[in-house]
Amino acid sequence: MVKFTPSFNRLVGEFAKLPGIGRKTAVRLTLFMLRQTSQDALALGEAVRELKERTRFCSRCFYFTEEDPCPLCTDVGRDDQLICVVEEPQDVIAIERSRSFRGRYHVLHGSLSPLDGIGPDDLKIDALLERLQQNNVKEVLLATNFDVEGEATALYLAKVIQPFGVKVTRLAHGIPTGSDLEYVDEATVNHAVEGRREL
């Protein structure tokens, strides 16, 4: 078995914590960093530090931002009466790429998953309900993923939103079951937004 230095192993371990990065890729990334100049390697560390210091979640929609509220929440060209609920920030990016949605967003930061111990209190559902109480929202578009957890989350949200008298719609099924929005092409997301249906 190949032996690595402690500092090499430490960086491999840190890279391996990233989503989609296994040990082999972590080793390749670490070898790449070894070939970089000290200045380039330090620039990466500085970029990570700056991200952690400056970026936070918007207090309204929970998308990431450097200013609070975020530009998506302060954009006067967006429809305040329409809120799109997504699981993760990357889902906002996928929908924005499609250029088919001009309302507001609400990021839950997860989906209901009782087997993993994730219930309604672990998501940004209460904040969504507060927004519905305080604002003149006419429609909530549920854009959770089309997997078991995403469907369960959408059904739960439809139930708790119902007393507000707000129209609740769901993305059309142009998006394959079991897929994550971030991996779907723009045209498919656009079709799904345009073909949303009421729940």
Curated annotation (Swiss-Prot):
Into which family does the record put it? Answer: Belongs to the RecR family.
Q: Which Pfam families match?
A: RecR_C, RecR_HhH, RecR_ZnF, Toprim_4
Q: What's one GO MF term for it?
A: DNA binding
Q: What is this protein called?
A: Recombination protein RecR
* C4-type zinc-finger residues: 58-73
Q: Does the keyword Metal-binding apply?
A: yes
Tell me which CDD domains the record gives. Answer: TOPRIM_recR
* UniProt GO BP: DNA recombination; DNA repair
* Record function comment: May play a role in DNA repair. It seems to be involved in an RecBC-independent recombinational process of DNA repair. It may act with RecF and RecO.
Q: Which organism is it from?
A: Syntrophotalea carbinolica (strain DSM 2380 / NBRC 103641 / GraBd1) (Pelobacter carbinolicus)
Per UniProt, which keywords does this protein have? DNA damage, DNA recombination, DNA repair, Metal-binding, Zinc, Zinc-finger
Cross-referenced SMART domains: TOPRIM (SM00493)
